[in-house]
Each structure stands twice: as C-alpha cells, then as structure tokens.
C-alpha cells in the first residue's frame, strides 16, 4: 500500500493490505533492519500516520541521524544521551501516573483500557536502541533496562507503547524475556540467520533475501512469520514538510479548542 493508506484507527495501524499492527491488543513493536532496508522510512511513515490521530509521540535518535532532524518540526525529539535517558524516565513516570489516575476517573471500569476513557495513546519511538545501550555504563544500562521492562509489561492498559528499532536485535540488550514482550516484530532488509533467530526465536523457516528496498519479514503477534513490504513512499515525498504540516494542524486545532473553552471563540 502507499503511505496515504497507512491509517491508525481503533487501536490498530494498517501497514499492508492484510497486515495491521493491533497495538491495543498486541502492544510494542520491534524493528530490525540492516542498512538500506528502509527502516528509517518505515519509522517516518509510522510517525506520519500516528500524527493524524491524537497520539502523543516521543522520538529518540541516539545517532543524531535522520530522525533527529524532526526536532525542527515537532517537540519531544532527542538525540543526546542525557536527554534520551530523561525522556525514558518521563515516559515511564507518565505511564505510572496515568495508571493511577485512570482508576479515579468517572468512566473507569476494571479491564477497560485508556481508549475506553478517551485518553490519547503515547508512543516512545526509539531508533538505534543497541547503539544507545552501547554508550552507557553498566549502572546506566541497568536503570534504562529496568524502565523499559516496566513499560513493555505495564504499558498496554495505560496506552504507553514502545517502538524499538535497531540494526540487529542483540540478545545482550534485549535479554530477560523483554524481547518476547514485543508482539509485532518486523525484520527489514538483509539479515543474517542469527539476526532472524534473535528476532523471531528459533523458527523452522527459510528466509529468502531478495534485493528489494523495504522488504522483510513480519510476525504480527501470532507467531506466524510472513513476507512484509513497507508502505510505498512516493518519489519526492518530503517527510519533514508533511510532519511539520500535520504538527501545525494539530497545534491550530488545539489553539481553536483552547479559545473555544475560554469562551473567546
């Protein structure tokens, strides 16, 4: 499908004609991609689609590469080590706080999630995760892993979701069963046998390497691995411009709502 057809609604994000990420039911996405696999475009496509909803996003790009450029057009984009660590902590605190306040809300019902209470989902989009972990001291690593573990275990109900991307999902940095908490896993571009087994576990499947940008394999949370093609980005599509436009629209909308609420409309 083309990127205009990538739409998020009712806790589900459509990514291919027959592939959606049902983040409300099967939370957290893990993306692995070798160079030239189309990983960055795929992440930008997700950001653009989620901006059309009421989702709140936080973008972490420790290599200060393409995603860091988004800081020109949207808030909550970080690339410095300290800022990234602080953002993870804020995201975690926000999740814990929401879990508490949800229980006190009028419409709260046991077993219902954030969407039932009309709260917006929050997404922490973390590129080059392995590269980031390699920059940290042992102590810092433990603190970050602890927070991420809590987020993947507790985030679904409160609507706090993690999208983690890396070149290859090194077991060293996705240990302690944290990898299994990522229900939607996509491997883009060419990966080694080891890369695939780190991504999908030990599977009896032959992976064919076709030289097509944006092609890979996906497990949508059903433990069935199928071929995957990232949404097509038309030539000349300017993500920065489009994301900036959507961000502006959103701010204008909020300003209008604010004015209305203040009775100045």
PLM features: what roles do these ranges have?
Residues 100-121:
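Short helix/loop segment immediately N-terminal to the Walker
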Residues 195-196:
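Conserved beta-strand-loop-alpha-helix hinge in the C-terminal portion
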Residues 255-262:
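Phosphate-handling catalytic cores of nucleic-acid transaction enzymes
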Residues 204-222:
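Conserved C-terminal "switch" segment of AAA+ ATPases
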Residues 18, 223-227:
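Short, mixed charged/polar active-site loops
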Residues 1-103, 122-123, 130-191, 200, ...:
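P-loop NTPase catalytic phosphate-binding loop
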């Amino acid at each position: 499908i083309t990127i205009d057809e990538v739409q998020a609604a009712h806790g589900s994000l459509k990514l291919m004609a027959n592939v959606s990420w049902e983040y409300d039911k099967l939370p957290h996405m893990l993306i692995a991609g070798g160079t030239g696999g189309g990983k960055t475009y795929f992440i930008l496509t997700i950001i653009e689609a989620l901006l059309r909803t009421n989702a709140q996003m936080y973008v972490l790009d420790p290599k200060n590469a393409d995603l860091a450029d988004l800081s020109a057009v949207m808030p909550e984009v970080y690339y410095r080590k300290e800022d990234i660590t602080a953002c993870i902590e804020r995201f975690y605190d926000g999740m814990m706080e929401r879990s508490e306040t949800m229980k006190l809300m009028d419409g709260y019902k046991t077993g219902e999630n954030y969407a039932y209470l009309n709260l917006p989902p929050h997404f922490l989009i973390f590129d080059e995760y392995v590269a980031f972990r390699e920059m940290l001291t042992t102590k810092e690593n433990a603190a970050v892993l602890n927070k991420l573990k809590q987020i993947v275990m507790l985030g679904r109900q409160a609507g706090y979701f993690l999208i983690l991307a890396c070149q290859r999902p090194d077991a060293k940095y996705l240990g302690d069963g944290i990898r299994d908490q990522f229900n939607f896993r996509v491997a883009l571009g060419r990966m080694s046998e080891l890369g695939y087994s780190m991504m999908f576990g030990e599977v009896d499947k032959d992976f064919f390497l076709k030289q097509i940008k944006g092609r890979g394999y996906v497990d949508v949370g059903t433990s069935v691995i199928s071929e995957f093609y990232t949404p097509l980005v038309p030539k000349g599509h300017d993500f920065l411009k489009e994301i900036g436009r959507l961000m502006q629209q959103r701010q204008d909308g909020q300003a209008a709502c604010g004015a209305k609420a203040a009775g100045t409309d």
